[in-house]
Amino acid sequence: MPEQVNCQYDCHCSNCACENTCNCCAKPACACTNSASNECSCQTCKCQTCKC
């Protein structure tokens, strides 16, 4: 299984243009900031190149 840090959900970088079609968060560098609303922090994540 992919290693994740405090995050049961897929994270997306907010500055990724294709966040709706690509998971742009490089795991395991994502952490949930609010598990109730499923908000994740991509502070150390780098957005991958996405093709829409």
From Swiss-Prot:
One of its GO terms (biological process) is cellular response to silver ion. Keywords: Copper, Metal-binding, Metal-thiolate cluster, Repeat. One of its GO terms (molecular function) is copper ion binding. Induction: Both MT-I and MT-II genes are regulated by copper ion in a concentration-dependent fashion, and both are inducible by silver but not by cadmium salts. It comes from the Eukaryota. MT-II might bind nearly 10 mol eq of Cu(+). It comes from Candida glabrata (strain ATCC 2001 / BCRC 20586 / JCM 3761 / NBRC 0622 / NRRL Y-65 / CBS 138) (Yeast). This is Metallothionein-2. Belongs to the metallothionein superfamily. Type 10 family. The gene is MT-II. Sequence repeats lie at residues 43-47, 48-52. The metallothioneins are involved in the cellular sequestration of toxic metal ions.
